[in-house]
């Protein structure tokens, strides 16, 4: 047998193996009775295709609309969309025998022994959370109020300059608001983590650290797609990840490490660590890894949420008018708008909640594994080791949970009896349970304060041609597109 014949035999055996494996997955696998497309049941190639195209969340939404509350989306994978499933999977008993642990294959890591909060499991995760939580405590957040106010003022001045004819006469007051949402969130976040901002607002431009974080988030989604096709994931990482994204992790990590080292030399103790590297503190590497992953995740999700809120407000004049009226009637001058006082605006809070519902910041599911012995989820028995998740977009946009699900209606969060049938427990933008978002309060505080000051200082009007944020591509979170608004300065002096 010559070399060509041997190669043909190997290829033939490989193809035969995968045909037999696909046949087993469809007809004999323990999940065979769950509804879903047969091709997806046979192979992970279907999921990989939709992930790489950036439309996985919409694919899952369509599957749930067709097949119902539980769908088999892969050979060993189920997707849910009910409040019951959310409580069981994410909010259950945190004991070692009952925990729905993270699916480490879908989440890139080889094991749960990790140097960061996002991938660590068990006692390691509990330790990280206990040590990091004080940074995001309410008292700490209120103490950061003056810092956030300073960056809000820089944002106001930046928009004031660009909407005024004296600086940019050809723009006719039209500003793409998306970069500015990135600028302010990145400056606040970097100041919180490193003690100084990245000067995005002052320069009116992206810092390389911000762009690198954006690339890293997309790159991680491609890596997840590749890892779904083990043992071929290493070669697929090389083939799938676009060249333009390959330096994301490297650049972001390098800048973060440089900033962290500079901060450690300051006399002021670093707020994110304890005084000494004992068993009850974060090691230098743990500190770096946790800061890096928090910066990547928090920056993109919060800025994406802020731009989406601005879109839905300006696209819905009635909601916009109510939000503007509430802000301008609640305060007699801008100095009264603080991190604390902006929390007393019920309609603005409803606007934020509704934006999180109609376009969840994390639209896909957070992957978990069923524990040993299997578990009942939403009335269905699910075998141990099954990949499970709740598809956030599907849960938040289905008419079976929400009246007028596709419309932006903040009143549904204010006790309007017309929406009494809404299943509000299916909208959990920060997840629930022991692994819920540690920065939830911080993100909400930023959003309320920034929006309050924007609506106090400016009138906004949507320009034609803006894409609905629901139509954006999704790689971990949404890939925002330009959002052009006509901005009218109602407080500043004419230039």
Swiss-Prot record:
Function: Cytochrome P450 monooxygenase; part of the gene cluster that mediates the biosynthesis of the alkaloid (-)-FR901483, a potent immunosuppressant that shows efficacy in animal models and a probable inhibitor of purine nucleotide biosynthesis by targeting phosphoribosylpyrophosphate amidotransferase (PPAT). Within the pathway, FrzC catalyzes the coupling between N10 and C1' to produce a 1,4-diazabicyclo[3.2.1]octane spiro-fused to a 2,5-cyclohexadienone.
One GO CC annotation: membrane
Chain's gene name: FrzC
GO BP, sorted A to Z: biosynthetic process
Subcellular location as annotated: Membrane
Catalytic reactions of this protein: (S,S)-2,5-di-(p-hydroxybenzyl)piperazine + reduced [NADPH--hemoprotein reductase] + O2 = (1S,4S)-4-[(4-hydroxyphenyl)methyl]-2,5-diazaspiro[bicyclo[3.2.1]octane-6,1'-cyclohexane]-2',5'-dien-4'-one + oxidized [NADPH--hemoprotein reductase] + 2 H2O + H(+)
Protein name as catalogued: Cytochrome P450 monooxygenase FrzC
Keyword terms, alphabetized: Heme, Iron, Membrane, Metal-binding, Monooxygenase, Oxidoreductase, Transmembrane, Transmembrane helix
Family: Belongs to the cytochrome P450 family.
TM helices/strands, residue ranges: 8-28
UniProt entry tagged with the keyword Iron: yes
Class in the EC hierarchy, top level: oxidoreductase
Membrane-protein topology: Single-pass membrane protein
Superkingdom of origin organism: Eukaryota
Classification lineage: Eukaryota, Fungi, Dikarya, Ascomycota, Pezizomycotina
Any one GO molecular function term: oxidoreductase activity, acting on paired donors, with incorporation or reduction of molecular oxygen
Pathway: Secondary metabolite biosynthesis
Primary subcellular site in the record, as a coarse category: membrane
Binding, heme: 437
CDD domains, sorted: CYP60B-like
